[in-house]
Structure formats: C-alpha cells, structure tokens
Amino acid sequence: MPKLQFKSIPAELAPMDLLLEADPSTEQIHTYLDGSDIYTVLSDGQTVGVCVLKPHSETTLELMNIAVEPTQQGSGIGRQLLQYVISESRNKQAKELVLGTGTFGYQLAFYQREGFRVVGIDKDFFLDNYDEPVIENGIQHKDMLRLQLIL
C-alpha cells in the first residue's frame, strides 16, 4: 500500500463526492461544513478519504462525516484516518469525540473497534432530517445512535 498523507483543508475544497458516500444529503453536509475541521487522506497524490470534525465546545468535537473512496474501502484507510483524527483531537486538548450513526451497518462496528461506546439514541432522526429515505442493505434507517469516545 502506498504511503498515506493526511492534510487539513478549507471547507470550500471539501470533496463533496466523497462526503456524499457517508451522508446522502448535500443540504445536511452544508449545515456542518462551515466552522468544521476537514481532513483528507491522499494516496499517490489522490484524495481517497475525508473526515469532518465540528467543534461543539473547547473539549467536545463531533465527527460529522468520514468516508473513503469506494474502491479503497476495506484497505484500512478509514481506520488510519479515524486514528489520525483521534490523535489530532487529543492534540487540540479535546476531552471527548462524539458522533451519530445508524443503528445497524458496518459503521457501528467500525467505530466500536476504535473504542467508541453508545451513549444515546436520537429517535426518528433520519425520518425527521432527511427528505428522502436513507436505505442501507434494503433497510430504512430511522433512529440515530449517539456514540462517544473519551479522549
């Protein structure tokens, strides 16, 4: 595997095609891009991953979006990007990293492997916040799990 390069970029350069891999709503993405820290991962000069962290306070950051180029999924890039972002969060003196994800799917195990724990449920989040149904593996997402990693 080629050496990966991690880079912070401004919101206007965020790769929308990749962000849409993790969040199917352009409107939702635009609600959290401004004021967020955006990190990309490059392989051979090509952007293959992206992550968006939104500060909620001096000690709490929310992982709003993390995505890897579909042809590169399963190669460990997402795990390395998440570990990089966790390290960057600690460097910023954050005390916790929080996120929301669906109640099923590979994403839940992905986060739990890195130490995130379920701390709550936002009932009907996907029904109330998305114009179109969010479907994964033929099942509609309705509720959002809230996860937390104590740094």
Regions inferred by a protein language model and the residue ranges of each:
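Conserved catalytic-core motifs of GNAT/GCN5-like acyltransferases
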Residues: V98-G100, Q112, R117-G138
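Conserved acetyl-CoA-binding loop-helix of GNAT-fold acetyltransferases
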Residues: G74-S87, R113
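Short beta-strand-to-coil "C-cap" segments at the C-terminal boundary of structured domains/repeats
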Residues: Q148-L151
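Conserved beta-strand segments that form the floor/walls of ligand-binding pockets within enzyme
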Residues: E62, A67, G76, V98, ...
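Conserved GNAT acetyl-CoA-binding A-motif
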Residues: S89-G102
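Short acidic/polar active-site loop segments enriched in Thr and Asp
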Residues: T59, K95, R117
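Acetyl-CoA-dependent GNAT
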Residues: P2-T71
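Short hydrophobic/aromatic beta-strand or adjacent loop that forms the aromatic wall/cage
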Residues: S36-I38, H141-R146
